[in-house]
Amino acid sequence: MSNSNSRNKEAETVHHLTSRIAHRVYFLKECERNDLLEIVRRAADFTGIRLLGWCVMSNHFHLLVLLPQRVEVGEREVLRRYGVLKGQMAAEEVAGSFSLWRQAGDAGEAKVVRWLDSQRRRMYDVGSFMKIVKQWFTEEYNRRNGHSGTLWEAVYHDRGVKCEGRAMAACLAYIHLNPIRAAAADSFDGYAWSSYAAFCRGDGVAVAGMRYVYGVEYTCDEMHQRHEELLESLLEKEKLRRAAEILRMRAAGYDAPLDPLTTEAFLQQAARHFEEVRQEALRLREERMISESAGSRQTVLEREIVAALTLKPGSDAKDLSEVLGLHVATVYRLLQAMANKGLVTHGEHGGFWCA
């Protein structure tokens, strides 16, 4: 989804944003990942978007952001944000231009207003935020590497996330698990360009993002514990998914080597687990089939009882058992069930009638 989507301006929405390097032929060095994160922070400050979490990989990045309610941004705040984005010297130059323009009276004041409005239109908009991030980083990357042209895929991905703790935490954990899945780190907090590592270091933006996701009632230690548990759960699911794929490939006769998340011992354990799951599914299916069969048989017998009572109203369980060839106790249970459903009525002397 591109930055033309109207949801990009819908206030109080949470977005999972992803963008990849075009053709995945370039890989970001460590210093370039640092530069990208710095641009992300500056763009978020300028646009008013709140960073909840991030992870910058070698050829793509993930961001979890909150688009807050738009607020009125005065001249001083516009200049402050512009300084964050462009540098303090650029902001001072603009402020100096304002002074010169205003000497021209109303026409100059109108020019100031137009400039301020042009900056305000770039704020509180996910599309504008992503445009700044991608465009600014491309310019820096091209300058540093002697490259020209586009760096990113044309369209970034924007997936809406329910603004609810569990959904946001699951998305954030998915983002933080990227380095483990890619074998770029061997611990959840061991990847420097992840907001989880920043949270563990006490980074203010990362801590505030985790607090928004988990709730202000939790301490940092409690958030750390809850997030670690969620990451462990997701990692286990990922390992099982990869094990299932390897086992399917091997069963089909293909050479399927292990990856960094699996071992032969884990594959054997996973195979036993999958077989247990398969057997349990078969057992439940058989139970359901038996239950459905029993239900169908009961329906048939109920119809036969109704037919018998139509021919001979007032028959009791013994009379009906002789007609149907069933045990008296079975017929009586059927009659009681039918009475509860309102299909038959029970007389004072033990007989039954169709309702």
Q: Where in the sequence are the language-model features?
A:
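Short Pro-Cys-Gly-centered "Cys-loop" motif that presents a nucleophilic cysteine in a tight turn
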Residues: 1-58, 66-304, 310, 322-323, ...
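Residues within the helices of the helix-turn-helix
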Residues: 307, 318, 336
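A generic structural motif
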Residues: 61-64, 351-352
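Proline- and acidic/polar-enriched loop/turn elements at helix boundaries
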Residues: 56, 187, 333, 350-351
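Short, cationic-aromatic polyanion-contact patches
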Residues: 295-302, 316, 346-355
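Short amphipathic alpha-helical interaction segments
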Residues: 327-337
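Flexible coil/turn residues that form the inter-helical turn or adjacent wing/linker of helix-turn-helix
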Residues: 313
